[in-house]
Curated annotation (Swiss-Prot):
One of its GO terms (biological process) is DNA transposition. Involved in the transposition of the insertion sequence. This is Transposase for insertion sequence element IS1106. PANTHER family: TRANSPOSASE INSH FOR INSERTION SEQUENCE ELEMENT IS5A-RELATED.
Amino acid sequence: MAEYSGLTKTSSALPRLSSKRTYSLMRAEAPSESVPYYSYCLRLRRLVLIFVNPLYFMRYRNWLAQDDTLSELLELINRQLTEKGLKVEKASAAVVDATIIQTAGSKQRQAIEVDEEGQISGQTTPSKDKDARWIKKNGLYKLGYKQHTRTDAEGYTEKLHITPANAHECKHLPPLLEGLPKGTTVYADKGYDSAENRQHLKEHQLQDGIMRKACRNRPLTETQTKRNRYLSKTRYVVEQSFGTLHRKFRYARAAYFGLIKVSAQSHLKAMCLNLLKAANRLSAPASA
C-alpha cells in the first residue's frame, strides 16, 4: 500500500478525491425501491470513470517496464503452470527464433540507402519512434523491432529479448540461454550460427542444435545440408507461437513507441500466449 501511495502521490495529473466524495460514490447500492435503476447505473458509471482512469494504467505499465519485473512475472506464471502439470518442468530442448514487430508510428517518407546486396547501409530514424530501425524482410523494407524468443519443446515462451529490427540475431543468443539446465539442446536457425555462439554452448554444456550457414567460397557439405533439413523440422513450435501472436493477439504491429514500452508489451503478450496454451490443454479431451 505504501508503494501504491507513493506512486500516485507523484502523479499530479491524476484526479484527487475527497474522502467524503469517495464514500458517496462508493455507495452505489443495488437497485431497489429507494434507489431507482437509472440512478444506480449513473453512480456506478461515475465510479468506474474516476477509478478506472487510463492514466493509472499507463503509469503503472510504465513503472513495470522500467526493470525486469515483467520478466520475473513471466517466470512466475511458467512456474505456476509447471506446478499444475500444464508445462514440462525441465524440457530437454529450447527453440530460439526471432520475429519482426513493426513500429506503431507511420513510416517515414524518405529514401533508404542500401548496399549492393540490398541491405540497408544508412541509419534512418523515424520521426516519432526514435528506437525503431529499418530491415529488409522477404523483399520488403519494414520499420520496427526484432523480438528474439526462446520457447520450450511445447511452445511455451520462456524468455524474450527486444532489439531494434536491424540487430543481427547471432549477437543476441547468449541472453536467451540464461537459466537453461546443462544438457539442454538449443535449436536455432542459421541466423544464430557463429563461432562465438558455438563456443558459448560448449562452455555452458549445452547441446548444439544451430543450423549451419554457408560462407562465401565454402558451401555446405552434404552432411551439413541433411543436418539442417532435420533441424528445421524441430523448430515449428516457435513459429507456431509467432503465428498465434500475429493472428490471435494482433501483434504484428506494436501499440507503443520506444524500446522499453515495446519490450513490456511483448512480455505481456507472451504471458497471454502461455495462459492460452494452458487453457487449451485443460479444455482438450483426455486421451483414452
